């Protein structure tokens, strides 16, 4: 059965490219690639041409996210599968695929209206070693696990789960979180490879399409260094350092220049083969800066 293999890339619209250039390189450690186009910057995390594209814009939000399939046969099968399910999509032109640095591309939207892309054949620049934007002890966890994970806006969780299930992701509710208003939050997590989850939703109403992007370091010291830099620069921290119950990653959440969150992490376990749910995190993740959509009782 055809299925996506990883969350391969993201495109973001940003109102301040200069602030992002500093944040991505000096705080996160990503490599900045400026090809002189004027309206965009590319962020590298490994030997791919890029994992993130920053598009200069008058808004700050998710522009698109790309899900990878293995090859052109799988690509055609996925297009046929989605079309048969009644999902409207457009197979992109060769020029559009070249702009994304891939061999094949289809464009559609998920049930939350998030621009979604299916692709195969990313450009991988093995002749250009990854050079982090600041000193790093290790690397980013990418490879077959993709860029990381993101939490997206979805008003209809069952419809979103069905859509991502059609793409080949698996998962379910992984937390029951008692809220101060008496309600119980039940966020939904889904995976398509060994990464514990690649997409999640069900946090309730969101101003932007995306709540946060999580990426992971291979070395704990890089997480600690990033945490020190964030604190020294007085960047808003929405959730303090803590350890999740589901992926068991040590992480913290801080604001990026676009006013939503990046989750910096280390040490996540692999995706489980059977479903579990939790009522709180292992430790930490106390709420700090409010207003970023993560004012939930994880600790």
Curated annotation (Swiss-Prot):
Domain VOC: 6-121, 146-267
Catalytic activity as recorded in UniProt: biphenyl-2,3-diol + O2 = 2-hydroxy-6-oxo-6-phenylhexa-2,4-dienoate + H(+)
CDD domains per record: BphC1-RGP6_C_like (cd07237), BphC1-RGP6_N_like (cd07252)
Keyword list, A-Z: Aromatic hydrocarbons catabolism, Dioxygenase, Iron, Metal-binding, Oxidoreductase, Repeat
Disulfide bonds: none
SUPFAM superfamilies per UniProt: Glyoxalase/Bleomycin resistance protein/Dihydroxybiphenyl dioxygenase
Top-rank lineage group of the source organism: Bacteria
Pathway entry: Xenobiotic degradation; biphenyl degradation; 2-hydroxy-2,4-pentadienoate and benzoate from biphenyl: step 3/4
GO molecular function: biphenyl-2,3-diol 1,2-dioxygenase activity; ferrous iron binding
Record-level GO BP terms: xenobiotic catabolic process
Binding site for Fe cation: 149, 212, 263
Cofactor annotation: Fe(2+)
EC number: 1.13.11.39
Assigned protein family: Belongs to the extradiol ring-cleavage dioxygenase family.
Subunit record text: Homooctamer.
NCBIfam families: 23dbph12diox
Protein name, as recorded: Biphenyl-2,3-diol 1,2-dioxygenase
Organism, as annotated: Sphingomonas paucimobilis (Pseudomonas paucimobilis)
Lineage: Bacteria, Pseudomonadati, Pseudomonadota, Alphaproteobacteria, Sphingomonadales
